[in-house]
Amino acid sequence: MGFGMIFYGLILMKNAFESVRGSEEFEKIFLIANADTFKGRFLCVMIGMIVTAIIQSSSAALGVTISLAIVGLIDFPTSVALILGQNIGTTITAVLATLNASTNAKRAALVHSLFNIFGVVYMFFLFNPYIKLVNFLAGFIVSIFNSLYILI
């Protein structure tokens, strides 16, 4: 039942974004925030981080990103850059929770944030090889399934 509700929610978000698909103002945002350039990639990471920090739910932000990708408003590299930003933005919840906490709790939140930031910086510089690898593997897996389908 839980998985069904998740997919139902994704369908609802997809349908909501289909109505905005033709909006020029909405599409301009994603033309500016396109992960094809270094600047655009950085902007996508910042957008993902800010949106996730505001709504304080990386799952909801990821659902929105998936819905935008399904509708075709953003491409795969842009969605990956947004998800990298969401990875940093999700740490704001831990930071906010430790505002009136002990020193050790603040240290744990700081380490959590730094770990995610370093992971995103690491992936930021490996971004293009990662995208190429995923595209290659996706095509490779599809060709394997096509071959198996022909054999069966």
Residue spans for each PLM region:
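Catalytic cores of large soluble enzymes that bind and process phosphate-bearing ligands
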Residues: 1, 5, 17-21, 57, ...
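Transmembrane alpha-helical segments and their short flanking loops
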Residues: 24-35, 99-152
